[in-house]
């Protein structure tokens, strides 16, 4: 199984605590697929909403494919996500009752098909973000101090 990651949403890991991850297919036009293969995608401000029993990806920027300018697409249009009905109902229930949100984490190709990894997430408060940054800095310092001392 070959996976080629096109885009990751680093801001989602900073702003949210990730609870559960799901893999979803995505409905795209031909020019969008070609643009994705070039790596022209941005997930920074994107989010997932469930409307009428269907999952939709909003604000995902996929740059227009230059050679197909004649048949171009809207770069930030809403795109349908392909999930099983059980998964959609499960996500819908959790989002309604607990105040959670669904965010896309990365876009990638798996066996030639475009996929989106989405996650059920809970927003972090400012002090939680600071704690996470301090923890990351401490890990980095520890690794740096051990780097020169361990020899095999």
Curated annotation (Swiss-Prot):
Record flagged with keyword Ribosomal protein: no
User: Predominant location of this chain?
Assistant: cytoplasm
Subcellular location(s) of the protein: Cytoplasm
What's in the GO CC field?
cytosol
- Keyword flag RNA-binding: yes
The lineage, from the top, is: Bacteria, Pseudomonadati, Aquificota, Aquificia, Aquificales
Function as written in the Swiss-Prot or TrEMBL entry = Required for rescue of stalled ribosomes mediated by trans-translation. Binds to transfer-messenger RNA (tmRNA), required for stable association of tmRNA with ribosomes. tmRNA and SmpB together mimic tRNA shape, replacing the anticodon stem-loop with SmpB. tmRNA is encoded by the ssrA gene; the 2 termini fold to resemble tRNA(Ala) and it encodes a 'tag peptide', a short internal open reading frame. During trans-translation Ala-aminoacylated tmRNA acts like a tRNA, entering the A-site of stalled ribosomes, displacing the stalled mRNA.
Domain of life (superkingdom): Bacteria
Which processes are annotated in GO (biological process)? trans-translation
Tell me the keywords, alphabetical order. Cytoplasm, RNA-binding
Name the UniProt record assigns to this protein: SsrA-binding protein
Gene assigned in the entry? smpB
Q: What Pfam families does the record point to?
A: SmpB (PF01668)
Q: Which organism is it from?
A: Sulfurihydrogenibium sp. (strain YO3AOP1)
């Amino acid at each position: 199984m070959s996976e080629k990651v096109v885009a990751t949403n680093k801001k989602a890991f900073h702003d949210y605590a990730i609870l559960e991850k799901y893999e979803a297919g995505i409905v795209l036009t031909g020019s969008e697929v070609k643009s994705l293969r070039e790596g022209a995608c941005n997930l920074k401000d994107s989010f997932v909403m469930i409307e009428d029993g269907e999952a939709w990806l909003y604000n995902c920027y996929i740059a227009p494919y230059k050679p197909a300018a004649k048949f171009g697409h809207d770069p930030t249009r809403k795109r349908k996500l392909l999930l099983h009905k059980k998964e959609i109902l499960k996500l819908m229930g959790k989002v309604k009752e607990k105040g959670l949100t669904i965010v896309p984490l990365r876009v990638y190709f798996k066996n030639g098909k475009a996929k989106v990894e989405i996650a059920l997430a809970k927003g972090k408060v400012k002090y939680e973000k600071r704690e996470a940054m301090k923890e990351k800095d401490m890990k980095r310092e520890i690794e740096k101090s051990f780097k020169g001392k361990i020899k095999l």
